[in-house]
UniProtKB/Swiss-Prot annotation:
This is Bifunctional glutamine synthetase adenylyltransferase/adenylyl-removing enzyme. One of its GO terms (molecular function) is magnesium ion binding. It is an enzyme of class 2 (transferase). Residues 433-929 are annotated as: Adenylyl transferase. Belongs to the GlnE family. Involved in the regulation of glutamine synthetase GlnA, a key enzyme in the process to assimilate ammonia. When cellular nitrogen levels are high, the C-terminal adenylyl transferase (AT) inactivates GlnA by covalent transfer of an adenylyl group from ATP to specific tyrosine residue of GlnA, thus reducing its activity. Conversely, when nitrogen levels are low, the N-terminal adenylyl removase (AR) activates GlnA by removing the adenylyl group by phosphorolysis, increasing its activity. Its EC number is 2.7.7.89, 2.7.7.42. It comes from Nitrosomonas europaea (strain ATCC 19718 / CIP 103999 / KCTC 2705 / NBRC 14298). GO terms for biological process: regulation of glutamine family amino acid metabolic process.
Amino acid sequence: MSTPIDSSRAASIVASILPYSRYLKRTLASEPGLQQELLDQLPNPFLWEEMLDFLQHPAISLEDEADLHRLLRQLRKRVILRLAARDLAGLADLNEVMTTMTALADTTIRFALEFLHTAMTHPGHFGKPTGEKTGTEQQLLIVAMGKLGGGELNVSSDVDLIFIYPEDGETDGRKSITNHEFFVRLGRKLIASLSDYTVDGYVFRVDMRLRPHGENSPLAISLPMLEDYFITQGREWERHAWIKSRVITGSSVAEATLMELIVRPFVFRKYLDFEAYEAMRSLHAQLRKEVDRRELHDNIKLGPGGIREIEFITQVFQLIRGGRDADLCIRPTLGVLRRLRQKQPLPGQTIEELTEAYCFLRKLEHRLQYLDDQQTQNLPQHPDEQTLIARSMGFTGYGDFLDHLDLHRQNVTRHFEQIFAARRKSPRHDTFARIRPEQSGDHETVEAFSKQLQTLGYLDPGKITARVRQFYDSTFFRQLTHSSQERIFELMPTLMEVIARFPPVDITLERILRLLEKIGQYPAYLALLQEHPQTLPRVAKLASVSQWASDYLGRHPILLDELLTSSGLHILPDWPALKTELTHQLHHVNIPKVQMVEWQMDVLRHFQHAQVFRLLVTDLEGDLLLEKLSDHLTELADLILDNVLQLAWQGLKKKHRELPAFAIIGYGKLGGKELGYASDLDIVFLYRDDHPDAASIYTKLAQNINLWLTSHTSAGILYETDLRLRPNGTSGLLVNSIEAFTQYQYEQAWVWEHQALTRARFVVGDREAGEMFEQMRKNMLCQPRDLVKLKREILMMRSKMLEAHPNPTPLFDIKHDRGGIIDVEFIVQYLVLGYAHRYPQLTGNIGNIALLKLAGELGLTSAGKATAALTAYRELRRTQHQLRLSGTPEPAGTALSRDVSQKFARVANNHLSDARQAVFQLWEDIFGT
């Protein structure tokens, strides 16, 4: 809001700031009439609406381009006068300065383009440019680059522009020309209207060198030409340049096509692009050479610790993460710094110092340019000018000012060098390099390599050497690009040093090499390991204790990003906060509608994989009980299902109500809250809706839900699903009404289906439908049953399951064999079905362990045997879980067989004998067999 300033105070303010701007002094002296206008308007920012009002004033008549040039320059003069006065007087902050200058550029470019386009498209002249494919009138897309694109333009800046037209064709006027020629001519006229220096000055210098092929290319290019250029010739520095690109003229459809379908995929990779570090280092090295050549060390933009280095820091994180995190796909540098503060890839102190330095340097840049309205970022050399600059920045002397400036530049340089520090080679690099395939034939090379391994503590260096040589000689390695091979060569010395710290080293090495085979085809992830060597010990530690964890990383290498810092890995999930975060990622993004579903599918997958991985790391540290782990994995599945249901419903074209009267019911491990890392989801779909189209609509919804869960995208899948527990199994309807489901349970369901119902629960969806299911479930489980018949049915089902899962090995199958997990589950299911009519508390969804304890307390079986069995159940599940994670035997001294199978979790027959005996005893107590 403007602060009132009387005329005498305004005059005093203007007089006090005139020494800091020779341009203001000259302009006011040459055009005295502008002074009163400045004094009257000094309290008010110069908004774009006022700029447009000036250009469109009824008293103004534009007859030709000379009139246009004059009007634009008169506007610019007024804007600069007021803006400089407000800034130097402390009435305008940095944001106002940048916003006002950006508005001036946008407004003058659009106004000039409209005038020139109208003149050129007169029927008696060239006529309207028409697309040869669409037949529609074509408009010039002007892309603002650099600071104009970012909405942070300088007061005496040039403007970086690129001219693009949607499609080729011809104009329809008397002097017909090609669209290309039309837009080139239009572009030249526009440039002249902005940059030609007349008696009234200029508006903006125009720089067109950022267009494809630079100065040697046509002034205007078509959209297809730009797309082809990005695909075939686009360079890394151009990705950096196009981050700030912004379309300021043209049709909204063409703008969306350009920015979202052509520019965005070029700038922001779908994966985490850690190769951007090396590209930015190269770009910075070129900048350094130019600074040295031109002696620009006192240039606050290009010199050490200058504005450009801050921009490089923000942009490298945008290039690395923007394809995954749409929050970072923004233009203003300060805006990116704010987002980085929220996302914390850098310490808060670093962000604060970079922000303060950027604001100080930009404020200084403007004061350097106010002196003579020159595009300069060089510190003054003359003592008088040094004094003026120091005082305009609020310092009494140039020395104090320089001390403050140097502090900011030193901070920027320090942070820049920390982020872009050159990779250090291991002291063993040269020796390890000689083991390369083309150099590893001689005995001396192998011996030198083995000796290095021996010094690292490897007990069998010959075996390890042979395995590394085999890896280098593999088809996989030979098919890698040269750059990927070089990355692995560079990584190997450090990897071998790290692996030596995590025995058993032969197993750890094997798993690491398998991981490299998985991620080697993604250079960005090899770059991650190079740029962040602190991740290597974390990867090796995981690999040393868990085959499953190592394989999971290989399937989802993007999870390496989770290992960049140890903070957050061992913190248990805050589900309300994670729910909010997921909602933001899914819905609060600027993604084209045609790409939204793919984006949301990948967001869900990345989110689910990240949460699983964080739980996995905490689990492997021994900080998580198995029951708590299952609770968290179930909470995660519930959250994913809730979001998938909403997204699938939104995606339906035919809907008859705002919210679906639809429920997802969880069975098995999902229903019993005993999910493991690789569990599939047993689900059933129900609805309560008497609309005539309800069945077909909800069937389509269920199909969509299953598609969202099981589709393989570039990010993998969410969950495998099992839909066979619905009425009549695979031959039954995919969705059922609550009434039909209830009737089936009472009239047609088999005993095994009622067994399954003991572990079922409402997961997500319509709450009323969920309550109806839960009431039906309780009523069904509380039906009195003939215990003799029930035992017979359950024993028959147990025999069928044993036949369906034969164990041809001498090992004990923890899940399927007698005395294993399924025996405990069948015992619990019998107790619920047999006695819930007397003890309704048995219908609670409290898990097998709690139900066993409750059965003992109720006297349904021996309390001692129930306690022993629930303890055994815990041990069986823990061992099964450990085996599936480790993929190897437990340490020496345990009875686990080396033939153990991850898939079936089998152990030596004499292992877990106490647990099995406890299960046998309870089984005999219940079933008498």
